[in-house]
């Protein structure tokens, strides 16, 4: 948040609606289904679709844990992951489409699409590099960034 000139303010999910309504915070990151389901559109006026997060969330397991599993256990986890992925992608796409249609239909709410993401990526590049080095996960971060190019 600081990279974009803001100050991050931790707010519990259950308190976010009121925090937005009273001006304790002036923005929040959420996806269209969440904005619709908890009625954030009542207390905010704009949703920017900058695709800064991957929804449904990705699943990551440590190599150390996976190496302790039997081949059959690993196969079961990967199979369950593939099945869950197929289901969730379909369910998420349908919910997101319906939520966006709803939000776009509101007269006092604006959905901004087709955002130029390059400036966002440039702003967070140094932070991402610094934190990856600090945590010793440069290769993992590179892998995730390369993987996300396929979506």
For each feature predicted by the language model, list its residue ranges.
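N-terminal secretory/targeting leader peptides
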Residues: 1-151
